Amino acid sequence: VEFNAKLCIMNMAVHGLNAKIKSGDEANSFYHDAHNLEGCCDYVMANPPFNVDKVKSESTQNAGRLPFGLPGVNAKKEVSNANYLWVSYFYAYLNDVGRAGFVMAASSTDSGNKEREIRKQLIQTGHVDCMISVANNFFYKVSLPCSLWFFDKGKKEELKDKVLFIDARNYYTVVDRTLNEWSEWQMKNLNAIVWLYRGEVDKYEKLLMDYRTQIIGDCYELDTEFEALSVLLKGYGGKLMELRQQVADTILHVEHINQLLPLNEMLKHYTAELNSSLKAFIEYG
């Protein structure tokens, strides 16, 4: 790591740029608060690495930002899972009305021992706003499920003793075999739940109007597509009647099997043309 930092400094110098590049414990977020953000942030958004282990507890303690104390420390004086260090940091960075939203391993929502005590203290602050359980396969490299945590130090007084829990583990859109996501409308639906919980009915009503507008537009497009399909089928109705008559006349006057070959080719042509038109209609409307 130290070599990489020196290499980076040299690269910046070659390009005529000044930079402060740190390495070792000085560059480790657990052991050093490089930006002195405690109590400064209006907003915190983060997707920290999950389940980091072997974090030196003494160095972490000295770096501060632990309003609820250290999570569990093992016999080697190491924090064996740093998830709750991140949770504590994000909370500590908020100012008096700050809000935080971050991704955390799903296992952190019900972990025991000292982490359970930290969760209890968090809830007692009245600043835990919402928790959302998310399905697996929401990351390209990680298949495990996760959860979304939201803090709000400026919560309304009537919500101080409440926490909204949303179980969205079965709510997603499949992108492919290894990846899920929320569609635009699915995210709006999750927002709607939060709005109603907070009493923001006007936002919910606006979303309903957006839905109404979308549905009306979809119905208009559907009517147009049905009309086009009807015209297409009527056109082929006449061709099919003509084809039927040609088949009947050919069969009536056929004297040898070879005389049916042109009829076979004609049927193939009509079938291919019909399939092509229907396919184009289905794909492009």
Predicted feature locations:
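Conserved short loop/turn motifs at secondary-structure junctions
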Residues: V1, D25-H32, M104-T109, N136-N137
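A conserved structural/catalytic subdomain of Rossmann-like adenosyl-cofactor enzymes
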Residues: E38-G285
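S-adenosyl-L-methionine
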Residues: F3-G39
